[in-house]
Structure formats: C-alpha cells, structure tokens
Amino acid sequence: MPSFSLLTGHFGALKQTIDGMPPNATLHSIMLKLSQKFRSGMFYINMWPFSGTWLVVATPSGAAQIQSLNLSKPNILRRPLETITGGPSLMSMHGETWKRWRALFNPGFNPNYLIGLAPLIADEVVVFCEQLRQKARTGTVFQLEPLTLRLTVDTICSVTLDSQLHHQTQDHPLASALQRQIEWASFGTTFNPFKRYLTVRPLVMWYNNRLMNRFIDQEVDRAYREQSGRQSKSVISLALRDYMKEKDGSLEDFKRRVAPQLRVFLFAGRDTTSSTLLYAFYLLSRHPEALAKVRLEHDQVFGPYHQQVHEKIHQDAKLLNQLPYTTAVLKETLRLFPPSASMREGRPGVEITDDNGQVYPTAGCNVWTLTVALHHNSAHWAEAESFIPERWLVGSDHPLYPAKGAWRAFEFGPRSCIGQTLAMLELRVALAMTLREFDIAPAYDKWDHIYPNDAVKEFNGHRAYQAEKGGGGAHPADGMPCLVTFRV
C-alpha cells in the first residue's frame, strides 16, 4: 500500500506518481506507474474523498480469482454507465437478468454468424478509405481519431441494427447524441470538483436520451415490420425474433429493454475499436518489419491488388480467418494499449491471494483488475515493453509464449466482452483494406510545432500515450495526428 497520510490519504503518493506525467494521462496510466512499486502485483489505494478503497490487481492468478467470484460492478461504474446507456445493460446487469439478455444476444455475436456480416463492415471501410484518400491528396497533418470513431459507429449500427447512418460523411443525430452523453458522463476519473459536481449534466443527458431512444425505437419497429418479409441478418433482428417467441415477449417491452443494450454496444465498441485501430497504425508505423509482414500476408490471402479486397470479402468472407500475423499484431496492440479494465465490488468474506500467499480481503473495496499493468508486468511477459507480434505465433516451449491468463483485453469467462469477435473482425477488415494502399504515419512532431505547449508529452516512451477524453476511455493523445500518403 502507498504511504498514507491522515490529512491527504493516498493523494500524496498519487501526486508523486503524477509528477512528470502528461496532465491528461488516463487514471489507468497513473496506476500503471504506481503499480511498478509493488512486486506482488496487488495493492490497496484509498481514493477519498472521490471514492473509497480500491484493491488493484495486476497478476494473472489474481485476475482469475476475481473472475471466478462472480462479483457485481460497483456503483462508481454502474451509475455513470447506466446514465450513458439509459438503463441496465449487459455491462451493468447481474444474475438471472444478465443471463437472459446475454443468451438473447449470444447467437448474433457468434463468430460463425458474424463472419457472414463482414461484407457490411467492408462496405463501411470503403467510405473510410475514401476519407483517407481525401486526406492524402491534401498532404496536411490531421487528427485521425475523428475518422476512426465515425467508422466504428457506422459499422456497429450496420451490424447490430442493419441501419446505415452515413456518419462518416455527415453528422447523424444518434452518433452526435451519444458523443455528448459520453463527454458529460463522469466515471470518477477527474479530480476537478467543478467538472464533477457543478454542471448542467442532468438536462443535457435528458435531451440526449430522448434523441437516442427515439431513433432506436424507430429501428426496432422497422425490424419488427420486416420480420414477415425480408429477413434481416442484423444482431437486433435475431434477438427480436427470439424474444418474441418467449411467452411474455411483447414489442413494447422489447423496445424499452433493448435500447440500453444497443447503446452499450455503441458506447463500448466505438471507443475501444477506434483506439485499437489507431494504435495498430501507430505501432506498425514504428515497426516497419512487422508492417512488411502484414502486407505480405494480405498479398498472399487477397492477391496483389488492394483494390480487390472489398470484392473478395463479399465473395468469401472466411478469407479473414486466414490472417494469423494480422491477428497477432492486433493482440499485441491490445496488450500494449488495452482500452479498458475491469472493476468489481468486493464482499465480506471474499479474499484474493497473491503469488506469495499474501491474503487481501475485499470487503469494503472495489477490486480493480488493472489490465494495462497486467499486460506490462515483466514477471509474466518476456520483453514486456516491446512490440513483438511473434509472441502470439510461437509454441508453448518458447520464452515469448504468453503466460496463461496474462492477456485480458476482453476479459475471460461468461462475462467476457460479447463484442470481442465483432471488434477483431472489424479491425482485420480495416487493416486489410488500408495498409497496402496507404502509409499512415504519426506526425506528433509537426503537431507539437503547430500547437506548442510546455506540458509533459510522453509516457512510457510513447508520444501517443493513452489520454483521458470523457467517459472513462483511453484515447491516443491529441487524437493521433498523422500524415497519410499513397504508397508508391
């Protein structure tokens, strides 16, 4: 446990940790730095007056214990999450209610089912590629994140709702309302009391709720009308058909209960997939040998002409399952820059034991599996700070082979991320359709020249450190300024 003061609690230790870090670094990054002082991989920290005591866990065995205990999400996460989603969702539900809704959506997120929706994803990436072409023609530095966020919103709505928002080419009310809702939500990651308490948040969120739910209601009504005719393959249509077969299933009840689920798919999938795509571009630009291997793999699977990838995905989407090195790059990207973590509420009588046999009671604590610290824990990863996609392709007898349970980008077990297959599929499609046409290079040096300031600009050796941007997400700093050029 960090040094404790009766006057300031653990904030003295936090201040020492924060000193020398970028001012907008994520709380995850702050805790990563702090965790390096605790070799056991577990420690308590008291966040009074903003929160209670946290038990931070950064070992595979500790994370596995937490997973097996079936603990609930704490109010510090559940309340702001349900503010964004408009009610209980798969991320905040527990018990039998969670099981029912997870079972309804599992078929739509099954890998064999989703691969059939890959052409819809490819159609959205076509628009993204045209956006990149326009940027390449200008030859100017721009922030890539707004483009990737719009791509992920369009993709998620296409797959889950069979609805084309065209948000990549024009603002859509649903996406705009979601963005505002996320920006106004507070997950307790800011220590500024004015931002936390003195806001017009309730009024803004009420308005956003109305906009989002109105759109979702219209789309569910459309899906219901089309059930007797055109059979949509969207995730929501599949869930609706199964729901209406239940003895107490009604359309109005489904609409009321499903809106938070769709909003959580948008919220959770939008930021995380966008950030992972950005970091994949970033890391591949820094590691040209890995980029060359990815491009070679795409040549071998899709043929030598990048213009044909979209058509080939439409003809045989299962080609996307033949990209082991591309998948390794994405898993290594998620290891170095995981977009989220997992927090659960401790209970009396529930204890976690570290690798040395030390017991940590969880009563009165929020138990935080700090994914970024686990992924950078040198006790469980060879060359933990290095980008080595090959670690995902070696045998179990190789020194680089990942330790069991040490990679938790999507968590494990029954409550693992339901959207992980969709996210990985979208990322593979995006890389396959962009990397052989474009060179995408971070341009932080030029950005810092245009927008100079005296703040610290690096963390852990990266200018593209994970930055806070509302809603508790981890985004590449400054929206990933870059230059895009056509490959010769």
Curated annotation (Swiss-Prot):
Query: Does the keyword section mention Cell cycle?
Result: no
Q: What induces it?
A: The genes forming the sterigmatocystin biosynthesis cluster are co-regulated and induced on oatmeal porridge or the fungal isolates were grown either on oatmeal porridge or in YEC medium (0.2% yeast extract, 5.0% corn steep liquor). Expression is positively regulated by the cluster-specific transcription factor aflR that binds the palindromic sequence 5'-TCG(N5)CGA-3'found in the promoter.
EC number in record: 1.14.-.-
What the protein does comes down to:
Cytochrome P450 monooxygenase; part of the gene cluster that mediates the biosynthesis of sterigmatocystin (ST), a polyketide-derived furanocoumarin which is part of the most toxic and carcinogenic compounds among the known mycotoxins. The first step in the biosynthesis of sterigmatocystin is the production of hexanoate by the fatty acid synthase (FAS) units stcJ and stcK. The polyketide backbone is assembled by the non-reducing polyketide synthase stcA by condensation of the starter hexanoyl-CoA and 7 malonyl-CoA extender units followed by cyclization and release of norsolorinic acid.
Names of the cofactor(s): heme
Q: Explain what the UniProt record notes about the effect of disrupting the gene for this protein.
A: Impairs the production of sterigmatocystin and leads to the accumulation of versicolorin A.
Keywords from the UniProt entry: Heme, Iron, Metal-binding, Monooxygenase, Oxidoreductase
Q: Which domain of life is it from?
A: Eukaryota
Top EC class of this enzyme: oxidoreductase
Please name the GO terms that the record assigns under molecular function.
heme binding; iron ion binding; monooxygenase activity; oxidoreductase activity, acting on paired donors, with incorporation or reduction of molecular oxygen; versicolorin reductase activity
Q: Does the keyword Metal-binding apply?
A: yes
Protein name as annotated: Cytochrome P450 monooxygenase stcS
Gene name tied to this protein: stcS
Entry-linked InterPro entries = Cyt_P450 (IPR001128), Cyt_P450_E_grp-I (IPR002401), Cyt_P450_sf (IPR036396), Cytochrome_P450_monoxygenase (IPR050121)
**Example GO biological process:** sterigmatocystin biosynthetic process
Q: Which family does it belong to?
A: Belongs to the cytochrome P450 family.
Pathway note: Mycotoxin biosynthesis; sterigmatocystin biosynthesis
Q: Where does heme bind?
A: 417
